């Protein structure tokens, strides 16, 4: 799969090697620093350090300069294999390396890499020598905190991030993209457009949607429900908590407890807030008996779930502790599986298209070594998923052994306006929960059979999808999603009566419109203000418009449409909303 870095690629090796060069530079400049780990990552590299003194962004230029000096030596990267005992002796003054070495078995191969005046515990691979790295093709980009081994109980280290490319041109292109990503950061735009907030004193990873953001969310959810009804789904509502016995039966307490919030003791029972909706949907299924004639059931829920994510992993609305999944479970018979999978795929493509996403990537994950379920069911399910992708002409990669232990899956990823991939839809077979909860239906031959269950999410989570939309559009939402679609700006109080007439007409037609009759701000200042708020249309009303009974429209991109009749202007906006146009 694409996010798995290609260890043999030249760029991977360069990024791994430059991380070692950075560590050497840091040790030369700050001699008492302790080193932890420094891997290559997507778009770059990082290294974690335990500094004696606090370092700042200003120190990065100094480190970069020292790195370039080291690169000029052209020193080779030389691999050596040593014993565990030798490794413990070699790194006796490096506590984080010692921690890693102690965790290795005595029989494990331990390799080190030497380069210039630096030696690191490392599996590689690396470039042959430093001459392979263009000294103008890298940049240190940021400093962050990172707990050792990702555990909040451990010491907070200093992580220095960098990026490296094959040449200076590629580096400049990446840095330009990075600036655009910063400009579109949903956390930044969330503040500027008054969309949402997070309150650390109330709880990290818990999202508060403000009126503007809540309006957009409501539009998304209303559209979601409407389309699900059209596609033969029933919508469910289930509780937010459940007794521990439910999570024991589902297996969550055995396999997922670390990601669950702590139990709550009430009425001599233990309760947990739900990390997933599946067991609740199964509980509804198991309230009665079902015949093959009843199948399939397509049950969907905008269900809020809670997962204990580490604080360091939280990120705006993208990675949170409480979020609303657009969850659905399809419960069907063997002979219905293929058509149901195909319909889910079609539905996913349609939904994305409505929100302005046309490019996608698909990944088919197959059976891992440890798995539950019948061998024939696995083979059939993988075949069905693959055939559905082929039938709909969806290109895909196969992730061999990448499926969950309980079933194969398709992961679908959209590509946003900045070329980034986002995991969105999942179509996942489950051979585990139907067995655990003893789900049955009466087949045509009168025998009790186990139904097939398909987990399915289209948007992933509402909060995360919201953040993706903000960044995809840079906050300039398509007209149908804009919290405020039209602002009326009268040039003076004389024309206010006509402005109120327009306001009433458009409001009655369901257009989200407001009147700004504040006399203390100049018109040009108002126009700039509403452009910065990314309101699609500004109706500028002067005495000429009153006399002629017309409207002049200015868009947020400064385009001008003059002299529209009232009904023409109304139809213009209505069509933009109906067709889900950007502007």
From Swiss-Prot:
It is found in: Cytoplasm. It is an enzyme of class 6 (ligase). InterPro entries: aa-tRNA-synt_IIb, aa-tRNA-synth_II, aa-tRNA-synth_II/BPL/LPL, Anticodon-bd, Anticodon-bd_dom_sf, Thr-tRNA-ligase_IIa, Thr/Ala-tRNA-synth_IIc_edit, ThrRS_anticodon. Its EC number is 6.1.1.3. It catalyses: tRNA(Thr) + L-threonine + ATP = L-threonyl-tRNA(Thr) + AMP + diphosphate + H(+). GO terms for molecular function: ATP binding; metal ion binding; threonine-tRNA ligase activity; tRNA binding. Zn(2+) binds at residues 278, 329, 455. One of its GO terms (biological process) is threonyl-tRNA aminoacylation. Residues 185-478 are annotated as: Catalytic. Keywords: Aminoacyl-tRNA synthetase, ATP-binding, Cytoplasm, Ligase, Metal-binding, Nucleotide-binding, Protein biosynthesis, RNA-binding, tRNA-binding, Zinc. Its cofactor is Zn(2+). PROSITE patterns: AA_TRNA_LIGASE_II. Binds 1 zinc ion per subunit. Homodimer. Catalyzes the attachment of threonine to tRNA(Thr) in a two-step reaction: L-threonine is first activated by ATP to form Thr-AMP and then transferred to the acceptor end of tRNA(Thr). Also edits incorrectly charged L-seryl-tRNA(Thr). This is Threonine--tRNA ligase. The lineage of its organism: Bacteria, Pseudomonadati, Spirochaetota, Spirochaetia, Spirochaetales.
């Amino acid at each position: 799969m694409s996010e798995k870095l290609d260890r043999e690629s030249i760029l991977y090796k360069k990024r791994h090697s430059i991380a070692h060069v950075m560590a050497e530079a840091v040790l030369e400049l700050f001699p008492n620093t302790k080193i932890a780990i420094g891997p290559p990552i997507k778009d770059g590299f990082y290294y974690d350090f335990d500094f004696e003194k606090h370092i700042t962004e200003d120190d990065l230029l100094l480190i970069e300069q020292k790195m370039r000096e080291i690169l000029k030596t052209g020193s080779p990267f030389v691999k050596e294999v040593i014993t565990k005992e030798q490794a413990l002796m070699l790194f006796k003054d490096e506590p984080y390396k010692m921690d890693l070495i102690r965790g290795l078995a005595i029989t494990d191969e331990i390799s080190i890499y030497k380069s210039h005046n630096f030696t690191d515990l490392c599996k590689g691979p690396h470039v042959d020598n430093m001459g392979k790295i263009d000294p103008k093709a890298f940049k240190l980009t940021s400093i962050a905190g990172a707990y050792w081994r990702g555990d909040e109980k451990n010491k907070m280290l200093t992580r220095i991030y960098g990026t490296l490319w094959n040449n200076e041109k590629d580096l400049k292109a990446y840095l330009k993209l990075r600036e655009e990503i910063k400009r579109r950061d949903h956390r930044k735009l969330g503040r500027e457009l008054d969309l949402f907030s997070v309150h650390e004193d109330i709880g990290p990873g818990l999202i508060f949607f403000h009126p503007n953001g809540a309006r957009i969310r409501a539009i998304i959810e209303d559209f979601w429900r409407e389309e699900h009804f059209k596609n033969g789904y029933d919508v469910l509502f289930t509780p937010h908590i459940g007794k521990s016995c439910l999570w024991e039966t589902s297996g969550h307490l055995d396999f997922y407890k670390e990601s669950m919030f702590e139990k709550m003791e009430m009425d001599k029972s233990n309760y947990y807030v739900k990390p997933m909706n599946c067991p609740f949907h199964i509980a509804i299924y198991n309230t009665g008996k079902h015949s093959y004639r009843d199948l399939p059931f397509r049950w969907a829920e905008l269900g809020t779930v809670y997962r204990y994510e580490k604080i360091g992993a939280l990120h705006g609305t993208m990675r949170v502790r409480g979020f609303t999944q657009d969850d659905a479970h399809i419960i069907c018979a063997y002979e219905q599986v293929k058509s149901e999978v195909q319909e889910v795929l079609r539905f996913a493509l349609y939904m994305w298209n409505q929100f302005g996403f046309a490019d996608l990537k698909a990944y088919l994950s197959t059976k891992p070594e440890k798995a539950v379920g019948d061998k024939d069911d696995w083979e059939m399910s993988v075949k069905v998923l693959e055939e559905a992708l082929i039938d709909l002409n969806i290109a895909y990669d196969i992730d061999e052994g990448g499926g969950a232990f309980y079933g194969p899956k398709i992961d679908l990823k959209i590509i946003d306006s900045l070329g980034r991939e986002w995991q969105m839809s999942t179509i996942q077979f489950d051979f585990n929960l139907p067995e655990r909860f003893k789900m049955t239906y009466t087949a045509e031959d009168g025998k009790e059979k186990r139904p097939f269950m398909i987990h399915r999410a289209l948007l992933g989570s509402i909060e995360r999808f919201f953040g993706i939309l903000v960044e995809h559009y840079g906050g300039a939402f398509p007209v149908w999603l804009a919290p405020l679609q039209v602002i009326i700006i009268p040039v003076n109080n004389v024309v206010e009566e006509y402005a109120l007439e327009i306001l009433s007409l458009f409001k009655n037609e369901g257009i989200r419109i407001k009147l700004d009759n504040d006399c203390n701000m100049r018109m040009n200042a108002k126009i700039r203000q509403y452009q910065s708020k990314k309101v699609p249309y500004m109706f500028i009303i002067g005495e000429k418009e009153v006399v002629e009974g017309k409207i002049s429209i200015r868009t947020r991109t400064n385009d001008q449409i003059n002299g529209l009749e009232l009904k023409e202007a109304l139809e213009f906006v209505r069509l933009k909303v109906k067709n889900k146009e950007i502007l």
